[in-house]
UniProtKB/Swiss-Prot annotation:
One of its GO terms (molecular function) is ATP binding. This is DNA packaging protein OPG160. Belongs to the orthopoxvirus OPG160 protein family. It holds the Pfam family Pox_A32. ATP binds at residues 25-32. Interacts with protein OPG137. Participates in viral DNA packaging and virion morphogenesis. It comes from Variola virus (isolate Human/India/Ind3/1967). It comes from the Viruses.
Length: 270
């Protein structure tokens, strides 16, 4: 008998300790929009959020300060930017400690592809980032892009309508509570019964699951889906660009407006 239960994912649990999360699913599966839904929770603790991505993605406008976005089009640029970021994190932690405060950091890697598996600094972050108060989120289309040497330290595996074989391969290294066969059966059952293409199915490691045999589910927030800006998300993050907040928000609103008009035009013409 399968003893696993389906439960609503408690986002606040991500604030308890550093985590390493993988969001896996095909293009358009809802990975990014779900990640953005987590921001209102994450910014309560993580004041320094950095994005690494090969190309500009307008979805992040209004969520991450522009000077914290790193465009990494090659293996070398990813390694270089991560080394610089690590150095800045270490300096920031030293300053915070001198003032008897703590600083927490979040690194997000979106669609970086196979460059992830070859990045030594990323593997260091996955294995030892918790000692630098740093959490990691990887958005991948396939589990193959998750570095093999870092899979044993993944704390949250979020799947978006992926194949059971992909889930099985990912879970081989991840430390989980209970039998992996039961987890996969429950995962398959949820995907079959709850045919929501944007449903996030979250498997936690043996620490974050709080001793329970559970698989969590969650969905993106309505406000995020409707592209409603939440100013507090940027305000709660640290950046030297805060003085330019109004300009950044106006630019974001204009882009969203143009995007809506473009979508409306396409609908009319079709």
């Amino acid at each position: 008998m399968n003893c696993f239960q389906e439960k609503q994912f408690l986002r606040e649990n991500l604030l308890k300790m550093p985590f390493r999360m993988v969001l896996t699913g095909g293009s358009g599966s809802g990975k990014t929009i779900y990640l953005l839904s987590l921001f209102s929770t994450l910014v309560k603790k993580y004041k320094h959020i950095f994005l690494f991505t090969p190309v500009y993605n307008p979805d992040y406008d209004g969520y991450i300060w522009p000077n914290h976005i790193n465009f990494v089009s090659s293996q070398e640029s990813l390694e270089y930017n991560l080394i610089r970021t690590k150095s800045n994190i270490e300096k920031c932690i030293t300053v915070a400690q001198n003032h008897k405060k703590s600083a927490h950091f979040l690194l997000i890697f979106d669609d970086v592809g196979d460059k992830l598996s070859k990045c030594n600094t990323l593997i260091e972050f996955l294995n030892f980032g918790r000692h630098l108060n740093t959490s990691i989120i990887l958005l991948c289309q396939t589990y193959r892009h998750v570095p093999i040497l870092g899979r044993a330290n993944i704390t949250h595996f979020c799947s978006f309508n992926i194949s059971i074989s992909d889930a099985e391969n990912m879970l081989r290294s991840m430390p989980v509570k209970g039998k992996r066969k039961d987890i996969l059966n429950m995962l398959n059952m949820i995907q079959t019964v709850r045919s929501n293409n944007r449903l996030a199915i979250i498997i936690e490691d043996s620490v974050f699951c709080e001793g329970e045999l559970r698989i969590c589910t969650d969905t993106a927030d309505k406000d995020v889906i409707e592209q409603k800006l939440n100013i507090d998300i940027l305000v709660n993050q640290y950046s030297h660009m805060k003085k330019n907040l109004n300009t950044i928000l106006e630019s974001t609103k204009t882009k969203l407006c143009n995007s809506d008009q473009s979508s409306s035009s396409k609908n009319v013409s079709s």
